[in-house]
Amino acid sequence: MNIFNGVTQFSIPDRTVVTFGKFDGIHMGHMALINTAGRIAREQGYKLAVFTFDVPPTLHFEKFEATQITTNYEKRKMFADAGVDYLVEYPFNENTASMEPLEFIRKVISGNLNAAHVVVGSDWHFGKDRSGNCDVLMAAQKLYNYEVHIVEKEKFEQREISSTWIREEIQLGNMENVNILLGYPYMIIGNVEEGRHLGKEMGFATVNIYPSPEKLLPPYGVYASKVIVDGEEYYAITNIGVRPT
């Protein structure tokens, strides 16, 4: 997977099928976009591209909080596993945020991304003050030689799946609901830290994981889990909170 991180001057030589999103928490709705774009890319012989931002737009305007359901590292891994050929992590700053919708279409969608097909959600907005929408995107498709595909929002129990909803469930510790809404098990990927080896004294293996600081964690408590080490899966009990071992 080719990655363009934090740059505005780049060019993709291949014609692409591209989908857009903040992808602040990759859930069933996001996977519907990626899967639709991937299917079109395979059928048409184009490359699959994902466009997102190097930092979530909310972090640009607000103080830092641990609110990411899916960290940047986790997102990259999931995109690669989904067969994405090009990942664009576009810089979000005053200059790029003030880009008019038609300028964004001309410079980025048609220019940088070399898009043949554009796959977006029905509520997608882009450009200065979020003034661009699906109607604007479709109005320009003939001029810039791309085709628009609109994917409806995924729902669970008649409610639209959103990152906001998933954050609420994580903060409540409703991890079964979280896994349903994500479409895969909630995960924590982190570095191993040296502990006090108390688990060894009690006759079972333990490992202390330090998660990424932007990762949104469930409440302190003990959770049934699986641990993957060097590709091997183990059933485990995970303690979220002050390390006991």
Regions found by a protein language model. Give the residues of each.
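N-terminal catalytic cores of NTP/NDP-binding nucleotidyl/phosphoryl-transfer enzymes
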Residues: 9-71
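Short acidic-hydrophobic, aromatic-tinged amphipathic segments that line or gate anion-handling sites
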Residues: 2-8, 88
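Phosphate/ribose-recognition catalytic cores of enzymes acting on nucleotide-derived substrates
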Residues: 195-245
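A glycine-rich helix N-cap at a beta->alpha junction
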Residues: 74-88
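A short acidic, helix-capping loop that chelates divalent metal ions and anchors anionic groups
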Residues: 57-62, 95, 160-161
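Classical nucleotidyltransferase
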Residues: 98-205
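Residue-level signal for inorganic ion chemistry
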Residues: 27, 79, 118, 178, ...
